[in-house]
Amino acid sequence: MIWTILHIIDIILWIIIAGSVIYVAFFAIISLFYEKEDHVAEHAAAISNRVTRFLILYPAYNEDRVIIHAVEQFLLQDYPKDHYTVAVISDHMQPETNEILKELPITLLTPTFEKSSKAKAMQYAMTEVQGNFDNVVILDADNVVRPNFLSQLNILCSVYDAIQCHRCAKNANNDVAVLDGASEEINNTIFRKAHNRLGLSSALIGSGMCFSYKLFKENVFKLSTAGEDREMEALLLHQEVFIKYAPDIHVFDEKVSNQDNFQRQRMRWMTAQIQSLLSNLPKIPGAIIHGKVNFIDKTIQQALIPRSILIVLLGGISIIMTLLIPAWCEKWWVLLGMLAVALYITIPSQLRLQSFKKVFSIPGLVLRMMKNILHIDRNNTDFIHTTHEK
């Protein structure tokens, strides 16, 4: 009797974990398919001769170390100066930092929030910054872009109302940063590139985002959690707005480089994932009836087991089963093999060797993530800040 119960538990657990592995493996394979170049936006931009008027928002909470460099680099754009406005929302930054920012050709906002959040900063900016804009770009305070960033976006804005740029690592100074950068590229491959290749919407990532001004203003005031990017994504997909992924428009982002920051970052992400899942689930019946495939897919994403946990969980179960119940172990090794191949495919070739050298750091990081699970509060809307250095 006890063996029957254990076998049932084994099968149920395998099915639950297999769902996450199969999802990752499926989109990893899709990412290998050839994609025709998208010339629609180029033709539309050429015909309309459009020069988009951009509002660039930098929500900056306690970001004194990085914000000045990021803004100075952005101001090197090869785009017409009178067609973009940079607004920094300075929240809890030092007076000395604000004085330097005031000397730059930007709009500096200095709100005072009882409880700070990125959503509140963006809402404040949309209320305070006046002007005739076509599109809004959201960047984090540590983000650095190339001089042709706006010129590239201008082309896509002729066709798409929501664009996610290619956010990639600007630092690889230790094991944590390397693994965080590799994780970002895996997400880019699975949730952005592969999804677009199937005609599905890209996932948003919190920065390097561009929206039509009207669309953003209609939705930004609906944001209320610390996972504002997931909230925005769910709102857009429920409205059937397609999100375009722009792999050639790079936004260089600082990766977390210490375990405490990693734990805080993952705590924020895991809380946002649970909040998003619980918020989306009641809308699923309506989404099914109206054929909102992107919204359904997004809800499935929120139910996936985080990959780092998946790697350690599968590895641990496979070894334990091999030692204790060899007859039940094969299916677990198959899943682990599928996951390993999928991750190999989704990591860019230039990062593979460097990433796999750091694989032994994963268990320690996963342990910190597991600790987070005990502290997740689905009703928590507090902003969990991770510090930046570069």
Regions found by a protein language model. Name each.
Residues 1-72:
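N-proximal low-complexity "stem/linker" segments adjacent to membrane-targeting elements
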Residues 29-33, 37-41, 45-46, 301-380:
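Membrane-embedded multi-pass helical conduit in multi-pass membrane proteins
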Residues 52-55, 85, 231:
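Cell-envelope/extracellular polymer assembly enzymes that use nucleotide-activated donors
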Residues 68, 94-102, 148:
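Acidic helix N-cap motif at the loop->helix transition within catalytic regions
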Residues 72-83:
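Short, acidic, metal-binding catalytic loop of nucleotide-sugar glycosyltransferases
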Residues 87-98, 113-115, 144:
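A conserved acidic beta->alpha catalytic loop
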Residues 110-121, 125, 129, 133, ...:
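Long helical/loop segments within the catalytic core of UDP-sugar-dependent glycosyltransferases
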Residues 132-144:
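Short beta-strand-to-loop acidic/aromatic patch adjacent to the donor-nucleotide binding site
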